[in-house]
Regions:
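Basic- and hydrophobic-enriched, low-structure N-terminal and domain-boundary segments
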Residues: 1-153, 157-162, 204, 498
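P-loop NTPase motor domains
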Residues: 27, 141-436, 451-452
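Composition- and surface-driven signal marking solvent-exposed, interaction-prone regions
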Residues: 33-40, 380-382, 424-425, 481-482
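Residue-level signal for threonine
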Residues: 101, 271, 524
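Short hydrophobic alpha-helical runs that function as membrane-insertion/retention elements
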Residues: 170-174, 195-198, 437-442, 466-470, ...
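Alpha-helix N-cap/helix-start and coil->helix boundary motif
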Residues: 178, 417, 445, 474-475
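Short, solvent-exposed coil/turn elements at secondary-structure transition points
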Residues: 201-203, 444, 472
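P-loop NTPase motor core of the ASCE superfamily
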Residues: 241, 245-251, 256-259, 356, ...
Length: 524
C-alpha cells in the first residue's frame, strides 16, 4: 500500500513539472513575441519553438503564472473527468471482455505443476489452501470445478483422466460403464494407491458396501432413510405431487426398521438384509385386526423402551388408517425390492470399502461403477456418496486444523446419473475449508437444472472454475455460455452518403465476445 502511494505521488509530481515547463515555455514565447495579442498567442502555441530551447525557462511573473496556471488547468481537468459521472474508458465503453492470457492464469498456479488441478493444456488451478492476497486481488478459489460438454466431447479422458494422473489427492469417482477403472486402475496401483471398487454393473467383481458401517446415531439413520426414499423413486428428480403422507409414512417406517436393526440387534446383524427380514414379518398377519408379527415386536419394544427412536417412528407410521398403512407397506416394499436380489444382498451384507480411509494420509482411490443402461441400482451410489461426504466432513471437523491431511477429490462423471445427494447445494458450499473438492460433469445446463431444480444456481455459484467443452446444439446452453463471455468493444467503419458526397468515420459498438455458434467450439 505504501509503495503504491509513493508511486502515485511521483506520477503527480512528474505531471506537475511537465505542466509547469509547458506553461512557462509558452509564457516566455508570449512575452518575447511582437504584434497583436492573437499573433503573440499563436507564437506561444508554436510547438517547434517550444521544444527548440527546452531549458530556456524564465522566473518572470508572466511565464511563472503561465506555468502555475497550466498545473491548475490540468488538475481541474482531471477532477472534472473523475467526478463528472462520465468515466472514460477508451475502447471499453460497451464492454471490456477479452480472452484470457497466460499472465491472467499465472497467479492461480502452484509453483509445483504436480500440485495443480489441470483444466486444459494451458490452464490449471492450484490445490493450495491459501493463495496470494493483494490490495487489488484475492487469488483464493475453491477447488470445485463444473464441466459442461455434450456426448463425445471427451469429458472423461480430457478432464477426469488428467486430474487422476496428477496423483496429488485421494479420489472418489463415479464411473459409468467402468471405463475409467479399466484405463487408470492399474496406473493408480503402480503409484501406491489402494484402489477400491463398488461395482453396481458387475457385482461379482465389487467390494462390499454396508451403509450400517457408517451409522453411529439417529441422525445418520434419518439421513440414510431419507436418501433411500428419495432415490428409490422411478425418477428422483421429479417433484412429489402426491399426498405427502405416502412418502412421509414410508420414511417413518424405514427409519423404524433401520433403528431397530442398529440399536436392538447384535453387530453381526447390522445390514440391509436384516432390515428386509423385519420387513417380511409385516406380511404375516393374524387375528381379526390383521396384526402382524412386526406390530408385536415394536409393541414390546415400546413397552420396554418408551423413549426408543425405533418405537416412536413405528408409532408415527401406525397412526395412519389401516388401508393407508397397508398402501405404505406396499409402496415401501416395492421400493426396497432391490435388496431382495441375491447379488445386492451379498455386496451389502458387510463392508470392505472402508470409506474412512479416504480421510487419512493414505493413498486411496474409490471407483463407483454404475451401469449406463439402467438407473435401478443408483440409489446405492447416492447413499454411498452422501455417507462419504459426511465421513470426510466429520473427520476434518475433529482434527485440530479442521482440514483433511490429504486433498480428497470427487470426480463425478455423468453426475445426474448417480441419483440425488440430498442438500448437495449446502454441502458443496462448505467443503472447501475441509480440503475437499468436486469436479461435476454435465452434458448441458438443462441437466443441472433438471437434477437440482431451483438449487442449480447455488451449485453453479459454488464452483469457482467452469470448463466448457462446447455447447452442443442445446439453445439454452449456448445462450447461457454466450452471456457469460460478456461483451467487448470493437471499432467499425461506418459509411454515409449525402448529396453525392461520401464520407466515413469510426464508431465503437458493443459486440459479444463470441456468438452462440462460436460458443459451440469453445474450450474455455
Amino acid at each position: 500500500m505504501k509503495e503504491q502511494r509513493t508511486k502515485q505521488v511521483l506520477i503527480c509530481l512528474a505531471a506537475s513539472l511537465g505542466c509547469f515547463w509547458l506553461g512557462n515555455r509558452m509564457g516566455v514565447l508570449y512575452v518575447s513575441a511582437v504584434g497583436t495579442v492573437t499573433q503573440r498567442l499563436a507564437a506561444a502555441a508554436n510547438l517547434s519553438k517550444i521544444v527548440l530551447h527546452p531549458l530556456q525557462l524564465s522566473p518572470a511573473p508572466i511565464p511563472v503564472c503561465c506555468g502555475v496556471g497550466a498545473i491548475l488547468l490540468a488538475g481541474l481537468a482531471y477532477l472534472c473527468i473523475k467526478y463528472s459521472g462520465h468515466r472514460l474508458v477508451p475502447q471499453k465503453e460497451y464492454g471490456s471482455a477479452r480472452w484470457g492470457t497466460a499472465a491472467d492464469i499465472a497467479p492461480f498456479l502452484h509453483e509445483k505443476p504436480s500440485e495443480n488441478i489441470p483444466l486444459t493444456a494451458t490452464e490449471s488451478l492450484s490445490l493450495a489452501m491459501k493463495m496470494p492476497v493483494t490490495a487489488e486481488n484475492n487469488y483464493n478459489r475453491n477447488k470445485n470445478v463444473i464441466v459442461f460438454g455434450p456426448s463425445g466431447s471427451g469429458k472423461s479422458y480430457s478432464v477426469a483422466g488428467p486430474q487422476l494422473l496428477q496423483f496429488n489427492s485421494n479420489y472418489v469417482l463415479s464411473d459409468p460403464k467402468g471405463e475409467l477403472l479399466d484405463t487408470y486402475g492399474n496406473v493408480l496401483v503402480s503409484q501406491g494407491y489402494d484402489v477400491k471398487v463398488f461395482n453396481l454393473k458387475d457385482r461379482d467383481k465389487s467390494d462390499h458396501y454396508n451403509p450400517f458401517a457408517y451409522i453411529h446415531d439417529t441422525d445418520d439413520i434419518v439421513v440414510v432413510a431419507k436418501n433411500l426414499i428419495k432415490n428409490m423413486k422411478e425418477d428422483p428428480r421429479q417433484k412429489n405431487t402426491a399426498d405427502p403422507i405416502w412418502e412421509e409414512g414410508s420414511t417413518s417406517l424405514l427409519e423404524a426398521l433401520l433403528a431397530y436393526v442398529y440399536f436392538e440387534q447384535p453387530p453381526e446383524k447390522h445390514n440391509m438384509n436384516s432390515v428386509m427380514e423385519l420387513f417380511v414379518l409385516m406380511q404375516h398377519r393374524y387375528g381379526p385386526q390383521g396384526r402382524s408379527q412386526l406390530d408385536d415386536i415394536f409393541e414390546d419394544l415400546a413397552m420396554e423402551k418408551p423413549a426408543s427412536f425405533a418405537a416412536r417412528q413405528y408409532g408415527l407410521y401406525h397412526m395412519a388408517p389401516d388401508k393407508t398403512a397397508q398402501s405404505i407397506d406396499v409402496s415401501l416394499g416395492m421400493r426396497m425390492s432391490a435388496f431382495n436380489i441375491p447379488s445386492i444382498m451379498k455386496i451389502c451384507e458387510d463392508d470392505t470399502i472402508h470409506l474412512e480411509e479416504l480421510a487419512s494420509d493414505k493413498k486411496v482411490a474409490l471407483f463407483v461403477v454404475t451401469p449406463d443402461t439402467t438407473t435401478a441400482y443408483n440409489f446405492l451410489a447416492a447413499v454411498m456418496f452422501q455417507q462419504c461426504f459426511q465421513i470426510l466432513v466429520h473427520t476434518a471437523d475433529n482434527r485440530e486444523d479442521h482440514c483433511l491431511p490429504r486433498h480428497v477429490r470427487f470426480l463425478l462423471d455423468e453426475f445426474p446419473n448417480i441419483g440425488m445427494i440430498p442438500d448437495f447445494q449446502i454441502l458443496i458450499s462448505t467443503i472447501r475449508s475441509r480440503n475437499i473438492g468436486c469436479t461435476l460433469i454435465y452434458q448441458s445446463i438443462a441437466q443441472l437444472k433438471s437434477q437440482y431444480g431451483d438449487d442449480w444456481g447455488t451449485i453453479l455459484e459454488n464452483c469457482d472454475s467452469e470448463l466448457v467443452l462446447g455447447g452442443g446444439n442445446n439453445p439454452e446452453s449456448l445462450e447461457f455460455f454466450g452471456k457469460q463471455l460478456g461483451k467487448r468493444t470493437i471499432e467499425v467503419l461506418n459509411t454515409t452518403e449525402n448529396l453525392g458526397a461520401q464520407g466515413s468515420y469510426n464508431i465503437f459498438v458493443g459486440s459479444p465476445t463470441a456468438s452462440s455458434r462460436v460458443a459451440i467450439q469453445l474450450v474455455a
